[in-house]
């Protein structure tokens, strides 16, 4: 009929249908799109693959509520469409009736009946309705009837509305068809979902069958365990733990019995619930005849559940019987454990003895392993051992693979179970097999690591021994001989002990092989048991959750049914009279029957699960037994470790075989070391001989120099004697004799010069010979190096071969290390897996606590598993600890060798830090490379030592040559001494010559007259000769310069010698030029004093004068016959002086060897030389006087040329000169006495020097002994230097890195210098700006004054508005204070002190007080206006005015309010349905009422929004008005709600205007701005917290709903409040400090800025947290509204408003009086 009606209506109202097609209706399109999206989401949830039981459980339990939500939302959308369709059909019926009555001829009357019947049957549109939605639809039937009655009345009154209703009816018909199609599609999808759920339930039943099969398999496994009981004698080592586990199992049995009782109680409860359901179904059966059959089905399902409960009880009884059997078995096991413990004690004693012997052997081996080549032999032995261990590992792996195959066969038997359980089982099996394999591998690797550690420690010890041997090889030879003897005895003892141990090892190996078989079988059983335990635990947890959820669903169904019945009674509807309601109830009954079927299926599943639980309990008993056996397996694995240790001992025995080979290598090494030591001894001897030869050469050179100086002194003495004679005869000497003397002098000087050149040539020849010998030695060295290179090539070949062997061994070692590392990684993964298992076990414990009795059994099992896992972890930690110790040893080796620079920084950062594996491997490789390089360097050093020994041999030959040269020099010294004797003979000859001269004087007096005539001619010749003499003197000075270059070692005395030589040359020139004898004697006395003080200085210039002086003496003796007596006296004195000089020379010969030692004494004598220099200065003065005398004498000579005939005058002058000479002789005698006293002093000093020499000789002997010790230490340091050379190579890399860093630092320093220069420039610029700002500060005075006036005017206006008295006498003070304020503000940043500063501060304080008064007045005015607003809120006219004012304020602060309003509207409208076009025609009166009732709350909210918005607006206002100078009082007075903020803003305006004063004030202003913004943000956060608190208090009232999220939100809010309070306090403290301090330091300002920045970041975080809290609160509110809507959907907004709008009649309940705008919108927060 509906199709006929649709076709007829479409034909009659085509124009209306065309306008109301779904494509043309936006509302229909939106709802259809929503329904499509929800249907797609449902399909996605349904179509997901549920291959495993867990996924099906997720679909059933987790995704079921999502499906329910989607179905409910889908039903709402469909409900809206159905209501609209119902509304349209009713309107069409009424319109059709009216048209039929008006036009009976045109409209057939049958269509009316059809339409009426269809309208009656239309409400049955939802064929399948969810149980929770039925009450919503029941209440709509009454409302629809009322709406129809009102609509007919409305149609009877107006015909115009009929046409519009026709159009809407046609549109609704079209929409109804579309909705019917969509609804059918959704129902099909829903049926698919139900089918999927049924399939899932069938799968659950299949799982139950598989569980039964698994039980059968567990029985088979139990039988296998019974067979294995005979083999557990040697495996049960933990008796105490097993006893504890047995007690726990007994407790678990008792708990299991209690669980069975609990299940019976639950079954009784289920029966009571079934009875309740029967009563409910009976009620429904009385009202609904169609649902009786379905309720009968439910009863049948309940009976099935009862049967299943009975089966569960039977299973519990079987379980108790099994527990009794298990107790009997436990008793038998206890007896067996006693026996096993006895066997275990004996084995422990043996094992301890073996460990003690092993420890002794290890100690002895560690002491015996001292040589370098032991590492290679031990590495070979270790490689062989590793191969054997790898073979054993392969055997174990093959056995494990067989075990895995058996386990796989068992898993194939259990493959019928669920795929997910199968996957988990496989994963557990893999992990457990990996655990066992890795445990066995780890034990084997432990053994290998121990061996490698021992090898490594041995290598370390060997390296240390090598270094010690290199440091002290000379002393170590004897020690090595003694050690070798000891080692041979030790090795023999060790071999004997090894033989004993090998016998013990053979016996233990046989025992261990028997245990291995038992351990392998026990491992398999343990794996199976652990897998089954994990399975059963997971299944029990899932079953318990399903039982809980089913009970919850049953309770919810009962509650829903009761609610439905109550709602039917409240609606006052009779089901018998209302056919429509009956049909709807039938639909609901059908749904309920389906639900009952589902419940019955669920209950069947539960019963099956209970059976499975019983089976699981049975299996757990078996699993416990298997766990006990697995413990025995673990003990067996530990015994394996003992086996491996014993094997290690056997391997050590094999090591001792290699020790013999090592002994041969040691003997070779010892021979090499002995050769090296001999070479080193020779080297040391040669070095000492070289040093002695060098010292002797230096001594010889110094002696030669001393002899030369002594020779010169002798010559000087002779020259002095000749000068004395000269002084006596110079006045009487003839010009001819002078010319002859000068010619002889020239010839003699040339001869001496030639002699000196010959000596130089001889020395040069010697140097060239030495060079030639050195060249030959170099050639020999090159040939020797070539030979050594060939040897080196051979050695390098050998070394390369050894390196290849080392590399192969290193590779094997690295492979073993990689295996160890992999084992560690796998152990770490297993530890994580164990931790995950512990977490899972903990979750199972929590679930078992809820199910008290059943969970206790599982908790104990989990505790046992955890204890076992902890034991395994302890073992793993023990192994990890050993690995850490190994790593620590590696780190110590690295530190000792300084291989890695990062070790030091790592030790500084973290003590005993674990090195990553990759890093350890890299470092080990580096160590190996360094070891190879060290070996290569040692070989290279050996070769270098051999080369050095050859060089030392050559140096020894050179030393022999030098000794021969030394002998030659000694011969030369003997010749010199002989020459000295010849000189003495010459002296005697000179005395004879003096006698002859006396005889010749008589003859010369006769010739005197002749000579006087020839004086003039000869004087000219004399001048020419004098010039030639000066040239010769210059040549001589050049020669002296060359001699000075040879005496560079005496650099300190060089300058003094040069000065003395120059002075002596000047004195000699004057002595030759002058004929004055007195002057000659003075010069001689000064020279002697200088010579006595200087101890033989180079006075070679006097040697050249000796020959000339002899001739002069001959000529002068002829003239001075009258003065023979004086000359004899002088000769006697000179003889005495010569004797003293001879003695001094002898002393000098003794002192020549001590020149090197006495250099320090010469430094002390430098002071005496300074005194001598003072004496020389006095002599200089005397020389100046002598020069004057010489000039006078020259004048006299000229006069003598003129006065040739005046011989008488000249004779008189000669007499005068003779008198003067007598006086001078007296002076010279006094000087001689002084010299004698000085010579005595020198004798005393010489004696002291002799004493010193003796003391120094004793010290030299002591030092020689010390040098012997130092030589030994030097050899050790030499080898230390070799080691340090290796380190230098490493340090060079570090230095290069550091140089790079230094270069970077230099670049940074350059950049910093540039920056500093820039800063200096900026500082200068800033100083210039400060000077300008100082000038500008004066301009701010009127600004401050104007600000004070503005404040004053604001005060007057505010007080006049408040009708308060203005304080008198403030204008003048205010103006003055303002002026002072301007001065203070302008002067504070600069730092000047003035009187205006105090006045300005007073003015600002006065302004603060005024602003506070204004603030109080404004606050009072606010309160007063608020009271007026509250009083006037009752009147509508005043309300409208206030609303307009609020709108104005909103416009004023709309920028701040706009962001909040959308969020609030979205939060209110986000979760509701879309609006229907009919619903938009809402009643304005209801909206008006709602607006009036919520006026108070809106006013409060507006005030809060204004307070929150005020700070931000004030900040913007301040920023916008930075540069303005106008008064801002009216606007601020109008806008500000918080006068304190206004005062702060006014202050901030002043601060912002003064930001240009200086950098410090700008920083302070920025800090204040940040602090103010932070305080305002905190204020807004406080306000929002208050709002949220109020909302929570409203939503948390009793009777509404309870949600644990509220407690969490409250905690967050409390934490927010505390944080806000702390931040507010810190902001206040910082702002007060800045305001009080004013111009602070940059450091303090930076600290404050950092604190403010941190505070702002915290505030941002708090704002984000506040947003999250607001979201959670909104979600909670939405949840509350949804829960309200579910309970009170009968009073839903859409239905109520549609009914009210259309019908405008009927009674309204108290709940309908709530003011709502539309049913599709939520009410305000107050209504909620």
Curated annotation (Swiss-Prot):
Function, as annotated: Plant-specific actin binding protein. Associates with F-actin at the plasma membrane and plasmodesmata. May be part of a membrane-cytoskeletal adapter complex.
Q: Where in the cell is it found?
A: Cytoplasm, Cytoskeleton; Cell membrane; Cell junction, Plasmodesma
Q: Which family does it belong to?
A: Belongs to the NET family.
**InterPro entries membership:** NAB, NET_actin-binding_domain
Q: Does the keyword Coiled coil apply?
A: yes
This protein's domain notes: The NAB domain, also called NAB (NET actin-binding) domain, is sufficient for F-actin binding.
Subunit arrangement? Interacts with F-actin.
Q: Give the molecular function GO annotations.
A: actin filament binding
The free-text tissue note of the record is: Expressed in root meristems and at very low levels throughout mature vasculature.
For this UniProt record, give its keywords in alphabetical order, as a comma-separated list: Cell junction, Cell membrane, Coiled coil, Cytoplasm, Cytoskeleton, Membrane
Gene Ontology cellular-component terms listed: cytoplasm; cytoskeleton; plasma membrane; plasmodesma
Using the record for this protein, list the coiled-coil segments as residue ranges, or answer none.
155-446, 476-827, 857-885, 954-1016, 1090-1323, 1403-1431, 1576-1684
Question: A Pfam family for this UniProt protein?
Answer: KIP1
**Per the database record, which ranges form the NAB domain?**
13-92
Q: What is this protein called?
A: Protein NETWORKED 1A
Q: Where is the composition biased (Basic residues)?
A: 1424-1439
Q: Where is this region: Disordered?
A: 1419-1441
Keyword Cell membrane appears in the UniProt entry? yes
